[in-house]
Amino acid sequence: MGKARAVGLNHIALEVGDIEEALAFYGRLFEFTLRGKSENAAFIDLGDQFIALQKGRKQPSDDGRHFGLVVDDKEAVRQALAAAGVKVLPGRFLDFLDPWGNRIEIVGYDNIQFTKAPHVLRGMGLARLVKAPQAIKELAEKGMAPD
């Protein structure tokens, strides 16, 4: 029997101090809808994926450990971070720490190989998103160019 092949991520779980505070914080930065919510968890919908916010962060802030959150407008996030008084971390990427120490890198959809299926983008109201030529070239080199 062969090994299973990893094909993607279903969700990311972030530990936060308080669910309502976390929803308010992330709501200042991003437009989103919830899949569900309880006293100890909330689920931010990303189409065919989600972010699970879980109450109970106890560890220190992340240093190098992070995840890249893909957005439709990276500059809008940069402006929202500034307006919210959130410090962008030094370096060439758009990284920040949330109030609970979760490190998040903001990545623009157009410039990376990550691709949502057209029907998922339509369902999210983002059918207008397209890839930059370099991202299409990188996908084509792997035999994955969009139609």
Predicted segments with their positions:
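Conserved short beta-strand elements that form part of the metal-binding/catalytic scaffold
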Residues: 32-64, 103-111
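Short, flexible segments with low predicted structural confidence
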Residues: 15, 52-53, 67, 129
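Residue-level signal for secondary-structure boundary sites
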Residues: 52, 75-77, 114
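Short, flexible helix/strand-to-coil boundary loops that buttress conserved ligand/catalytic motifs
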Residues: 26, 57, 81, 118
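Core segments of cupin and vicinal oxygen chelate
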Residues: 4-7, 13-51
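Vicinal oxygen chelate
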Residues: 2-3, 9-17, 45, 58-147, ...
